[in-house]
Amino acid sequence: MTMSASHNTILLTSAPMGRFLEGILNTACYPGTNMEVDAAVEPIGGKHTWQASSLTTGQRQLLAILLENEMVGKTCSDQIADEQKIRMYCPIPGDELLVLVSASGTGTGDAQAIGDILIRASGGTFIATTGTPEQEPFQVMETMTDVTSTGTLTHVMATGT
């Protein structure tokens, strides 16, 4: 996983007004991943288990972006191990954050320009919009080159769509 050189935290908005969620991580993930409730696992101590989003590209779903675990000294480039307690953030329009953007097609070398619109991809990442998606949740806020298939943390703004 590579990342934007200018930031070291997922949530960039200074006074976030979206919703913070907590849960338990099913399998290891990097911060910036879009998460979903693992419907096959009952809540543990009142907390749901979460996994990387598995929906088909472009489908509508709750946006819950995995945050870094700064309370134990982790950064947004540190993978979070499975079965750890996690925090996520559900952005509102205008919120700025870092999300994992992956290369589409061949898997390497994609570039994103400021203003590009992103859609959800399988595996909890986002890709440039294609076709007629149900939801286009983010707009790119920085130019990124050589986006990788495993995901590159990219500065985005939530669109609310």
Q: Model-derived features: where do they sit?
A:
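Surface-exposed, low-hydrophobicity beta-strand/loop segments enriched in small/polar/acidic residues
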Residues: 1-161
